[in-house]
């Protein structure tokens, strides 16, 4: 059975926004290594998803539909799954 690890809100927001670019690339590389090499199943809890949804709107001025779409994209990418 693969090990499961949760990500926090800041990581989910970074994955959804791609900002800042240099950190985004580093985070994606590290998470990809965990999933593909170390066979870790990454997840975002429901609370983390809700916090990221609010943060995208409040701090990044992302509309509700765009925030939903960005989070859906991350959570269906195969890298991170909802819990």
Spell out what each predicted region is:
Residues 12-13, 49-51:
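Short, catalytically relevant binding-site loops at active-site mouths
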Residues 1-44, 59-66:
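Short, well-structured N-terminal submotif of metal-dependent ribonuclease cores
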Residues 19, 43-48, 69-83:
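Acidic catalytic patch
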Residues 53-57, 72-75:
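Amphipathic alpha-helical segments within well-ordered protein domains
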